[in-house]
Design a protein with these regions (language model features):
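A late C-terminal transmembrane helix in Major Facilitator Superfamily
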Residues: 340-377
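Cytoplasmic helix-loop-helix junction between adjacent transmembrane helices
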Residues: 99-137
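Intracellular juxtamembrane helix-capping segments at the cytosolic ends
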Residues: 109-123, 329-344
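Conserved MFS/SLC helix-loop-helix module at the cytosolic interface between two early adjacent transmembrane helices
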Residues: 55-94
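Extracytoplasmic gate region of multi-pass secondary transporters
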Residues: 24-25, 211-256
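Helix-to-loop junctions at the C-terminal end of transmembrane segments
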Residues: 56-68, 265-278, 303-304, 374
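Helix-loop-helix hairpin linking two adjacent transmembrane segments in secondary transporters
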Residues: 93-95, 134-187
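C-terminal ends and interior cores of transmembrane alpha-helices
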Residues: 78-91, 288-310
């Protein structure tokens, strides 16, 4: 297996799915504007995406090694390419739900395959963490690009126009190119060494990993982190539009700062973690997240007389709040890497299945809860609520670290 070509292939997959997955914030805003749906209804898009990820991961994670990671990647890419090309033709909110369900289904295949391939390409914990952060950093570069790609298709003079749906023709073409590249890259199929135990047994094997207290605290931490990230990230464009009073296209463009900060943070984390212990590093990030929200939200009281015609006219809070992404950045890939690097490669698909499931559940609940609070009490209250899970993450990681130090050998038991 050519290591560099394989890294390029999985990075390309992650890039195109980054654009699609994290467009949900933009699509929520545009669905409210174009299809005249409520914030609560719009928040269900996250559920169609994330619950599809959870459902598919729950039932196929342990089977992907059998069909091969290359086949799984190609299947996911082709599925989404087809649905993207159909979306502008239907141009209805119900089909947007279908689109995100397809995106979630495909990403379950892609993420499990990518994480498992990272394990094959890494020889130790340091190389695993470094490659994980690099790939996740490229993912965030895709997210950053997505905001500008989508904003380029929005008519600032008529935000309710359906013209923005034409972006899916471009994305369908990009995904097709990615699928062709992955198909021709020589990715070796890892020999399946497990016993032929059947579907139910393999499914239960994955669930048995959660019996270990260390793994249980890990998945709780993942759930809470994604709850915060998706709650803020998915609703930041709407926050910019309705709380800060920015135009639709500028609201979306400024959200790219959030993605840029996460991309920068994840790329830098690979270097900084060579010198700083992971637990100290994560807690420092969580404290800075807490302070950013606490100090920035009072600044979002913007005068109604303020007129914004460009990104440089936006109030200071529009730049400071997305900066929280810099401190969020390393947390998700780092805690994933800590667990995955301690497991044998044959268990990576099962553990990644749990990661995907709890990430999806956290994202769904976070976006829905934020949408409901936003609808009933306003955007400021919705974002203040994220302080609670941030504190909960600190406690869960404290227990996780203690269990890791005392019973690290627990992770290597077969499941």
């Amino acid at each position: 297996m050519n290591r560099m070509l394989t890294i390029i292939a999985i990075s390309l997959c992650y890039f195109v799915f980054a654009v699609l997955l994290n467009s949900v914030g933009t699509v929520i805003l545009q669905s409210i504007t174009t299809f005249d749906v409520s914030k609560t209804d719009a928040s269900t898009l996250e559920g169609f995406k994330d619950l599809s990820i959870a459902f598919v991961s729950f039932f196929i994670a342990s089977f992907i090694p059998r069909i091969g990671y290359q086949v799984a990647l190609c299947l996911g890419l082709v599925l989404v390419a087809v649905v993207c090309l159909l979306t502008p033709m239907f141009a209805e909110f119900y089909f947007i739900k279908v689109l995100f369900a397809a995106i979630g289904t495909a990403f379950a295949l892609v993420k499990i395959s990518v994480y498992s391939l990272i394990g094959q390409l890494s020889s130790n914990t340091k190389t695993h963490s470094s490659l994980m952060n690099t790939v996740e950093g490229i993912f965030m570069v895709g997210v950053l690009s997505g905001y500008w790609i989508f904003s380029g298709f929005i008519d600032p003079n008529d935000p309710a126009s359906l013209a923005w749906l034409n972006v899916y023709y471009l994305l369908g073409g990009m995904i097709t190119i990615a699928a062709i590249f992955v198909y021709f890259v020589p990715i070796e199929r890892e020999p399946f060494t497990g016993a032929q135990t059947g579907a139910l047994s393999e499914f239960l094997d994955m669930l048995k990993l959660t019996y270990q207290p260390l793994v249980l605290m890990f998945v709780i931490s993942v759930f809470l982190y994604v709850l915060v990230e998706q709650g803020i990230g998915s609703w930041l464009p709407t926050f910019n539009r309705e709380v800060l009073g920015l135009p639709v296209d500028i609201s979306i463009q400024l959200t790219s700062i959030f993605a840029a900060m996460i991309a920068i943070g994840r790329l830098l984390a690979g270097f900084l973690l060579r010198f700083v212990p992971w637990y100290i590093f994560i807690n420092g990030c969580l404290v800075m997240m807490f302070l950013t929200i606490l100090l920035t939200l009072p600044m979002t009281q913007v005068s109604e007389s303020q007129v914004v015609t460009g990104i440089f006219d936006a109030p200071l809070a529009a730049y400071l709040l997305p900066a929280i992404g810099l401190f969020m950045a390393p947390i998700y890939p780092l805690i994933n890497s800590v667990v995955l690097s301690a497991l044998p490669n044959k268990q990576h698909a099962k553990m990644t299945g749990l990661i995907v499931i709890f990430s999806a559940l956290g994202g769904t609940f976070g976006s829905f809860l934020t949408g409901v609070i936003f609808d009933k009490f306003g955007g400021q209250h919705a974002f203040y609520m994220s302080l609670i899970p941030i504190v909960m993450i600190m406690f869960s990681l404290f227990i996780f670290k203690k269990l890791s130090a005392n019973r690290r050998s627990t992770l290597v038991k077969g499941a």
